[in-house]
């Protein structure tokens, strides 16, 4: 089973849902 099967949505979209701010800004 590929990760895409387990997570059919885009992981980046999931991150945006969890962290509505830009991750690059968080890293700064």
Curated annotation (Swiss-Prot):
- The protein's enzyme class: hydrolase
The UniProt record lists the EC number as 3.1.-.-
Q: Does the keyword Hydrolase apply?
A: yes
The organism's superkingdom is given as Eukaryota
State if Lyase is listed as a keyword.
Answer: no
An example molecular function term from Gene Ontology annotations: hydrolase activity
Keyword terms: Hydrolase
Q: Which family does it belong to?
A: Belongs to the 'GDSL' lipolytic enzyme family.
Descriptive protein name: Putative GDSL-motif lipase/hydrolase-like protein
């Amino acid at each position: 089973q590929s990760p895409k099967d387990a997570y059919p949505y885009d992981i980046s979209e999931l991150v945006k849902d969890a962290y509505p701010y830009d991750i690059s800004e968080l890293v700064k």
